[in-house]
């Protein structure tokens, strides 16, 4: 006898009983697999569904859809302060490349956030969850270690999401696409020394670039002079680099070259030197690190160490997608290749 569908919720068990099949067979018909069902049996199940008025469990379907969506969903978390980071052409280009590549690969960027937002428990529990994302990309993660209280947040994040890739540096032994800033700085400074410069100022950031600057001097038998180095304010890059360039050339008139921590600082330095009536590279040669798009179109064009941003993004997605299919317990980090791009600002012939 047909049950009263206005009184009771019809289940898959009811359909199976009416059709004279197992519940598994009903599931195969509803989901088109994974096992094949004969045409005769399929018709009996479909007839039972029609007679009983069966409707799939919407809640279960939503959970299934959510799980499927989460599998292809990625979160991006950036260290540092939001507005300051995205004002930097280097980082804004990386973020844009991440979104573009995700779209090409049919991956969904579920959220892009700054680490400071994770200190809000509501935000953390809503987003750092396997029902929301399967993978995480950590951009500029060294800035996430600025406060002791962040340690617990990071460890909870690692416990919840097991497919994580860091961009630039590794933290907590997580796999990373590592940018060797020390080697990049050594490359840029050595280029100036090989061109005959011995008095090289440094517009610095408080990171591994300082070690690379010092190592280049040591390798070429030159002393490190503290007075030749100014540490930039990373929250006001352009104005800080402009002002410190003027201070350096006024206080150290013997300088014949400058190494800037990044392209932004170098561009500000070129402007400052121009405003003081000095020519680049005739009076002061300049090198930097990043090779942003602006480096090639300013005049003089900037000699700078190329950071392979597009390759970094490509490697990141290759890693995350590979880990989903063939997870490796302790995946190795990858050192990103760097290359000096020689242009007019260093005064060297083009290569």
Annotate each language-model stretch with its function:
Residues 111, 116-118:
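Extracytoplasmic small-molecule ligand-binding "clamshell" domains
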Residues 2-5, 17-18, 50-51, 58, ...:
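Bacterial carbohydrate/catabolite-sensing allosteric modules
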Residues 29-33, 79-84, 170-173:
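A short, flexible beta-alpha/helix-coil linker loop
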Residues 1-66:
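N-terminal helix-turn-helix DNA-binding module of bacterial transcription factors
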Residues 82-90, 118, 142-151:
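Short, flexible/disordered intra-domain loops and linkers
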Residues 87-94, 108:
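N-terminal pre-catalytic "stem/leader" segment of glycosyltransferase-like enzymes
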């Amino acid at each position: 006898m047909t049950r009263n569908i206005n009184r009771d919720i019809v289940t898959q068990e009811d359909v199976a009983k009416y059709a004279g099949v197992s519940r598994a067979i009903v599931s195969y018909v509803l989901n088109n697999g994974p096992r094949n069902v004969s045409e005769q049996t399929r018709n009996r199940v479909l007839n039972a569904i029609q007679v009983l008025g069966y409707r799939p469990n919407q809640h279960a379907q939503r959970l299934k859809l959510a799980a499927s969506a989460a599998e292809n969903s990625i979160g991006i978390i950036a260290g540092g302060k939001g507005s300051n980071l995205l004002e930097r052409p280097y980082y804004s280009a990386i973020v844009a490349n991440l979104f573009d590549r995700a779209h090409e690969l049919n991956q969904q960027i579920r959220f892009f956030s700054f680490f400071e937002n994770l200190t809000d428990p509501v935000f953390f529990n809503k987003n750092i969850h396997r029902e929301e994302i399967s993978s995480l990309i950590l951009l500029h993660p060294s800035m996430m270690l600025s406060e002791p209280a962040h340690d617990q947040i990071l460890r909870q994040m690692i416990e919840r999401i097991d497919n994580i890739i860091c961009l630039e540096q590794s933290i907590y032994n997580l796999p990373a696409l590592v940018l060797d800033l020390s080697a990049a700085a050594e490359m840029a400074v050595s280029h100036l020394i090989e061109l005959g410069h011995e008095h090289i100022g440094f517009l610095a950031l408080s990171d591994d670039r300082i070690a690379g600057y010092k190592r280049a001097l040591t390798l070429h038998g030159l002393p490190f002079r503290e007075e030749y180095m100014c540490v930039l304010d990373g929250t006001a890059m352009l104005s800080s680099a402009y002002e410190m360039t003027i201070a350096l050339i006024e206080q150290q008139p013997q300088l014949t070259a400058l190494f800037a921590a990044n392209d932004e600082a170098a561009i500000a330095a070129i402007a400052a030197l121009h405003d003081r009536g000095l020519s680049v590279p005739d009076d002061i040669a300049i090198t930097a690190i990043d090779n942003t798009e602006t480096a090639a179109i300013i005049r003089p064009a900037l000699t700078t160490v190329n950071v392979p941003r597009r390759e970094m993004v490509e490697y990141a997605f290759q890693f995350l997608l590979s880990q989903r299919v063939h997870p490796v317990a302790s995946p190795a980090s990858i050192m990103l290749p760097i290359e000096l791009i020689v242009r007019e600002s260093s005064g060297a012939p083009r290569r």
